[in-house]
Amino acid sequence: MKYDVIIIGAGPGGIFAAYELMKKKPDCKIAVFEEGYPLEKRKCPIDGEKVKSCINCKRCSIMCGFGGAGAFSDGKYNITNDFGGTLFEYIGKKQAVELMKYVDEINMENGGEG
């Protein structure tokens, strides 16, 4: 199959890139390739008893897979310039907050909780 766009990685950046492309160009054929396992098969072997620390799995189920490392987080986003990154240094504080709010709106529209 031929694609117009191929995105490598289904972490937040890849997911949002595909989302934005679909909005702007609905007929665009997009493929997202991810090295990790499907969400329902992602499981870290650390159990605290037999396996107490990272064993360097070939594909880390915490880091790799749909949603990236954020798939298993509590889902909180920091909508501030005070901590958590330096995006504002590149696009300005006002635009950074607007972009953070935009991402939050999309997450809420797709089942996120406030």
What is the predicted function of each stretch?
Residues 1-13, 31-33:
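Beta1/beta-strand and adjacent pyrophosphate-binding region of the FAD-binding site
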Residues 12-13, 26, 43:
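Functionally constrained cores in energy, signaling, and assembly domains
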Residues 18, 22:
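Gly/Ala-rich phosphate-binding loop of Rossmann-like dinucleotide-binding domains
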